[in-house]
Regions:
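Beta-loop-alpha module in the N-terminal Rossmann-like domain of NAD(P)-dependent dehydrogenases
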Residues: 1-48
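A contiguous active-site-proximal alpha/beta segment in oxidoreductase catalytic domains
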Residues: 36-105
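Short glycine-rich anion-binding loops that position phosphate/pyrophosphate groups of nucleotides
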Residues: 7-9, 59, 144-145
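C-terminal glycine/acidic-rich active-site capping loop/insertion
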Residues: 171-253, 279
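Rossmann-like dinucleotide-binding domain that binds NAD(P)(H)
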Residues: 84-168, 173-179, 186-188, 287-294
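Short, well-ordered coil/turn segments that N-cap beta-strands
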Residues: 27, 52-53, 135
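Well-ordered, non-membrane alpha-helical segments in soluble/globular domains
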Residues: 17, 65-73, 99, 231-240
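C-terminal helix-rich "cap/oligomerization" subdomain common to oxidoreductases
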Residues: 1-6, 225-297
């Protein structure tokens, strides 16, 4: 098995050529996203011909934060038997591929079921609507992309929220935190006999404000050394579990038709958003929240 992190042709790299070379030797390939649909079709066909596997890895759905956001979205639905009534994704051009993958997995949606429309062409964020048979979601997409340094200059990498009347589930960043915030709703709050200081606390007042499912690492170095490799190990373990299964028996996200449809949705989203503004974000001053500013005299 070869893991390829060299960029694919659509972002100016030779990753797909490397993938082809390995597949031609009968070596299965896991290739880093994004990959153009035409390349995926070609490489999937080659993998089938050579009796091996070709999989695109979007990484972020497989790290701890992504997995817990996906898992708890599905747990909430199972408990209350209701789809989210609202949602929002904020991300950048470089990371929209993985954001769409996280969303589809959490909602158990096939990418073919999603349509994309442009609501407002703004700067620095554009507003698009992702529609599916169960509802709509607002996508806030960064308009700038640095062609010379695409992996940097994201105003937001991943910020994803799904909301229900009972509260909302947040993936605050690519590596967390993942939190559930309870909605404020107190029964009989207009009854003075049941006011907070007139009677024992109600069940609603005893509820915690939020529940934390995952706290992110302390530093970007911890992410690079631990969290990202763990995400890749997780995906490889999932692949190993279904290595001998026919494609239609594998988990949906590892099936060729899902992987191709996700890339097609990615292209459709970028086409709807229109051409990015090529450039970098101005240098910024890093925040230091641990340094004491002292008291005023």
């Amino acid at each position: 098995l070869a893991c390829i992190v060299v960029r694919s042709a659509i972002v100016g790299g030779e990753g797909s050529q490397l993938a082809q070379a390995f597949l031609q030797r009968g070596i299965s390939v896991v290739q880093e996203h994004p990959v153009h649909p035409d390349e995926i079709t070609r490489l999937q066909s080659l993998a089938e011909k050579m009796h091996c596997h070709y999989i695109v890895n979007s990484l972020y759905p497989h790290n701890k934060a992504g997995r817990l956001w996906i898992e708890n979205t599905q747990k909430i639905y199972q408990q209350i038997q209701q789809r989210p009534v609202w949602g929002q994704i904020i991300t950048s051009r470089q990371l929209i591929y993985s954001a769409l993958d996280i969303y589809c997995q959490a909602m158990k949606l096939h990418p073919n079921d999603i349509t994309v429309t442009l609501e407002k062409d703004n700067t620095p964020l554009q507003f698009l609507r992702l529609s599916n048979p169960t509802g709509d979601l607002l996508l806030c997409l960064q308009k700038h992309l640095s062609s010379n340094d695409p992996d940097q200059h994201s105003l937001v990498m991943h910020h994803m929220i799904l909301g229900w009347p009972a509260g909302y589930l947040t993936l605050a960043g690519s590596y967390g935190p993942v939190e559930w915030n309870n909605a404020l709703y107190i029964h009989h709050h207009q009854d003075s006999k049941k006011a907070m200081y007139q009677s024992p606390a109600t069940m609603e007042l005893d509820e915690p404000l939020f529940h934390s499912f995952h706290t992110p690492p302390n530093s970007w170095q911890d992410v690079m050394e631990c969290e990202a490799p763990e995400a890749i190990n997780y995906l490889l373990a999932e692949i190993d579990k279904c290595w001998q299964l026919p494609n239609d028996k594998k988990p949906m996200i590892l099936q060729p038709h899902y992987q191709l449809a996700l890339s097609q949705l990615w292209i459709k989203t970028l086409q709807t958003a229109g051409k990015a503004i090529d450039g970098t974000i101005a240098p910024f001053k890093r925040m230091n929240f641990t340094k004491s500013s002292g008291r005023r005299k």
